[in-house]
Amino acid sequence: MAATLVGKAGIVLKGAYSSASTYEIMDAVSYNNGLYIAEQAVPANTPPTNTTYWQAALDANVLIPNGYNHNGIYRGSNLGTISSLAQLEAFLTEHEVASGKFTNLYLGDYIKIQDGTYNGNWCIAGFGTEANKGSANIPNKNTLSLIPLGNLTSAPMNSTNTTGVSKNTDNPLYAETQGVETAGYQAYWGSDMAQITMPDIEAKLTAVLGTHLKTRDILCSMTMTPTTPSMAGAGANGASTNWGWKAVKAALMTEVQVYGSTVYSSSNFDVGEGYEKLPIFNFISPVGQGRAHWWLRAVASSSHFASAGYSGYADAGGASHSSGVRPLIVVG
């Protein structure tokens, strides 16, 4: 049999083989201390010894346990709770994250971070996805990219329906703009989301994760020109027209990181370093972990930011709407 079954396709771990279950192509099961991968749809009562339907992982050029392409294997297991730095460090050591082995960690696996406020379940969205990206703060490849399993909280992007300068006096940038449109203080970076909500999330997580919550650089939109036509189409006006590198510990995802392409993003300045789809979204849809509406990082128009829709569609919403918050963080 040719040893090309796996290639670059994704494997989905299904645990121990069950005779009562049916399986789909690329499902992987454990059986008699071995790992087997389905070559086609497998009917019930078809054990992995049936080579018409199954192939042993080693025969398929899949090495176990540390040779997996972890960005191509989805599992979705509960890994427990972390409420202290000591627990996190024990977790990182147990799973050999620093060496890049990622032992017994797979896409969709999640852990509850007990930060005292958000207490969210964070799932593995990718392994080393942010490696070597940035201007000054550059993560290495031996890191976990995490996103909340569901909405961490709800918040507006801005206090008014604008993707321009925030009118919120609580926004730290207001002291410099006084609410007057100023290039470099608009779009995602100038928003209340980036300046108020994200820093609060970062502070709460840092109290538990310490320096293992990595500071990284994002190349995000900073200027919005209301007269520039948006690539969102349908006559929408208002687009991101400049960007800059900014150091963050948490940031909303781009459309590309979720969908694999832009939909409502107003211009190339909405993508930046977030130019590739997170591996987890090769296995689940944006509503695959529950129906919810949540913000994305892209400007859609002068009044709207991009979002992921409750019913499983790409969307955009008025900036003052309170919607779900699901930031991307990097831990290692």
Ranges and model annotations:
Residues 64-332:
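Collagenous Gly-X-Y triple-helix signature in extracellular proteins
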